[in-house]
Design a protein with these regions (language model features):
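Short small-residue beta-strand/loop micro-motif enriched in glycine and branched aliphatics
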Residues: 71-75, 84
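Glycine-rich phosphate/pyrophosphate-binding loops
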Residues: 96-113
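N-terminal intrinsically disordered, cationic/polar leader segments
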Residues: 2, 6-15, 19-60, 67-72, ...
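Short, surface-exposed beta-strand-loop junctions and turns on beta-sheet-rich folds
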Residues: 80-82
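Alpha-helical support elements that line or immediately flank enzyme active sites
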Residues: 86-98
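Charge-rich (especially acidic), low-complexity segments
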Residues: 151-153
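Solvent-exposed interaction patches of small proteins and small membrane subunits
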Residues: 51-58, 74-78, 100-105
Length: 153
């Protein structure tokens, strides 16, 4: 049986994955990514801290996470329209998942999606750093949930 979701993508991310795979024009792909970024809600200024800044990203990019009902919710912002769109892709794809579900998502999806071939090396590196930061938040929240469960026992 063929696995149509080898990267363990969330339903939202799988939907975007399928949409982007069909785009073979670099300009159209960038337009679609930028359009995604315009849909992100305004990022709370109080969250623009060094701790929430994505390191190794050419653009000034922030990502924050909160745990609510055992699910992780992300918010973010970048001063680059393209990076804002990439951020929106990840936020849309990761938010509302459990920390465990987030940790199962394989970053290699970006290659098969067709996006990695269109990004400059520095943008691709920034995307990886953003993904890693979101994974780290999920890891921290998984530990938090585990310790909460241990305290209840």
């Amino acid at each position: 049986m063929e696995n149509n979701n080898p990267y363990n993508l969330s339903p939202n991310l799988l939907k975007r994955f399928e949409q982007f795979k069909k785009i073979d024009d670099k300009t159209k792909m960038f337009e679609r990514v930028i359009a995604l970024g315009k849909r992100l809600p305004v990022f709370d200024v109080s969250l623009k801290t060094e701790e929430n800044q994505v390191k190794g990203c050419v653009s000034l990019t922030y990502i924050a996470a909160k745990l609510e009902d055992a699910k992780v919710y992300y918010t973010g912002e970048s001063n680059s329209h393209l990076v804002q769109g990439l951020l929106a892709l990840l936020i849309e794809g990761f938010s509302g998942l459990s920390p465990s579900e987030i940790l199962l998502i394989d970053i290699k999806f970006i290659e098969d999606m067709g996006l990695s071939q269109t990004l400059t090396a520095s943008r691709a590196n920034g995307f990886v750093n953003t993904y890693n930061m979101m994974q780290n938040y999920a890891r921290e929240m998984l530990l938090e949930l585990s310790s909460d469960e241990a305290l209840k026992s």
